[in-house]
Structure formats: C-alpha cells, structure tokens
Amino acid sequence: VGSEMCIRDRTAGILPINVQKSGIDVLCFSGHKGLLGPQGTGGIYVRPELSIRPLKMGGSGIRSYEKEQPAAMPEHLEAGTLNVHGIAGLLGALEYLEKTGIEMIYKRERELMHLFLEKIQGIPGLTLYGTDDLQQRVPTAALNIGSCDSGYVSDWLYENYGIAVRSGAHCAPLMHEALGTREQGAVRFSFSHVLTEEEVRIVAQALREFAEEEMQQ
C-alpha cells in the first residue's frame, strides 16, 4: 500500500488541515507564502510510523564519525548546516500569525480580494480564471487582458504604478496546459492583509487603464 503525500506550497497558513482526518502520511509546505516566513524555508511532516530514507547524508554534527544519519527524527533528515537564520525568521512569522490570528488575516485578505474583483468588472478584454463562487476562492486572482503577454502586463504595472504582481506559469504548467495559456501565462494578484482598500482600488484602476489603452490599439 502506497503512502499519501500532500504538497501545501501555497495554502499553509491560509487553509486549515488535519493530517490524521485527511489520511495524510507526508505533508510538505513552504514557509515563505501563507506562513509569511523568509524564502528558503519550509518543512515536512512525516507520520511517526512511516520510515523515510534521507535524500542527503553527512554533517549531522551529533554523529560525525558515522556515515549514516541518526535514526531519530527530525535529525534523520537534517544533513549539513541548517538554515538557522531562515528558521528563526519563520519562527518569528509563526508567532506573528498566532498573535494576529490566521482567521482574521484570511478574512481581511478575502475582503480585499472581493473588492478587487468588484472593481475590475467590465474591464475590456479581461479574462478571470477560477470559480465564480467567491466562497471557494483563496485571496488570489489570476487573469489576462486580451492576448497580451502576461509579462508585458506585469512590467507595465510595475513601471507605471510600482505594482508588483506575478506573471508567467506560476510553477503550474499543467494548469496552463488545461487553460490554453501555455504561451501567454497569466497575471496573478495576491492580497496581503496589510494592504489598504485604497491601494486595491488603485491596482484595479491601473489594470483598467492598461486594458483600455491596449484595446484601443
């Protein structure tokens, strides 16, 4: 019987999960997205009964004269010098999340996303991807303007308004294959709880300005 592995690269710190109820044996997560930690951090949950072979060996510090990693977890998977600065930063982020409240943060981010989706309605040439059910959306929005390359849209927003968005394939090639956007990519907007409603309105207006200029050409 195989093991159940789950990748939570983008939803850790955003959506709740119970590994026992979900029957997950291995859970991998990134630390620099929903958990607000530094880049280069992340973690892995391994069901205690599961045996995993280390990808790398050596430099464990506590077993310097042995070729094999210590049997105990998590040292079993921790070869070499750890990213102590990154781990400290991730700890600080987790403490902030615990103090502020994940539910409060998520609620605020969704409110800002809803405002953005409301303000971009009617933008010429706009294609919004994902479900129309706002309750099923996480606080991101992926879209395109006509046939404009997503990188071009991203550059325009940054150069004219200092707005930073993500363009391209977003490490999701199969999704773009399914959407037919392999060459164009998509422009992704992510909403932080520290944004203001006025900033969201400015972003929506900038996108409208870009679209109206492009559609006139």
Task: Tell what function each PLM region has.
Residues 71-84:
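A short glycine-threonine-serine/GTX helix/turn-capping micro-motif
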Residues 159-160, 164, 176-217:
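PLP-dependent enzyme catalytic core of the Aspartate aminotransferase-like
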